[in-house]
Regions:
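Hot-dog-fold acyl-thioester-processing enzymes
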Residues: 1-50, 104-119
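HotDog/MaoC-like acyl-thioester-processing domains
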Residues: 1-4, 56, 61-62, 73-119
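Short alpha-helix capping/helix-loop boundary micro-motifs
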Residues: 51-55
Length: 119
């Protein structure tokens, strides 16, 4: 897996315990995974359909640098499934891994449409 995006954890990214807020991390993951999928399909009209079980393995605090990576799992007729991992850049410790994030190509009416990639 290639780690392409990095984020510096700032105070506004934290929860009440002083660690990275999970909702913020999921927002970043969805954005990173969407960009990765758009680059695979060369198609911008996609939506997030599903994410598999989400387990937070460790956390991050102010000043930590995290990095996010995605890799292709499979192509469907209208969908693409990828996995994503977020880890601490310095320690390489996994913070979260999502094994399956499913994106679907949609037409102008929001209906699934073939993305045209056959693999």
């Amino acid at each position: 897996m290639k780690f392409r995006t990095r984020k510096l954890i700032k105070p506004e990214d934290l929860n009440a315990r002083g660690t990275l807020f999970g909702g913020q991390m999921l927002k970043w993951i969805d954005e990173e995974a969407s960009i990765f999928t758009i680059c695979q399909l060369k198609e911008r009209s996609i939506v997030t359909k599903a994410m598999s079980e989400i387990n937070f393995v460790s956390s991050a605090k102010t000043g930590d640098i995290i990095e996010m990576g995605c890799e292709l799992v499979q192509f469907g007729r209208t969908s693409v499934t990828i996995s994503c991992e977020v880890r601490n850049k310095d320690t390489k410790q996994t913070i979260i891994r999502i094994d399956k994030i499913v994106f679907v190509a949609v037409d102008e009416n929001g209906k699934p449409t073939p993305h045209g990639i056959i693999k």
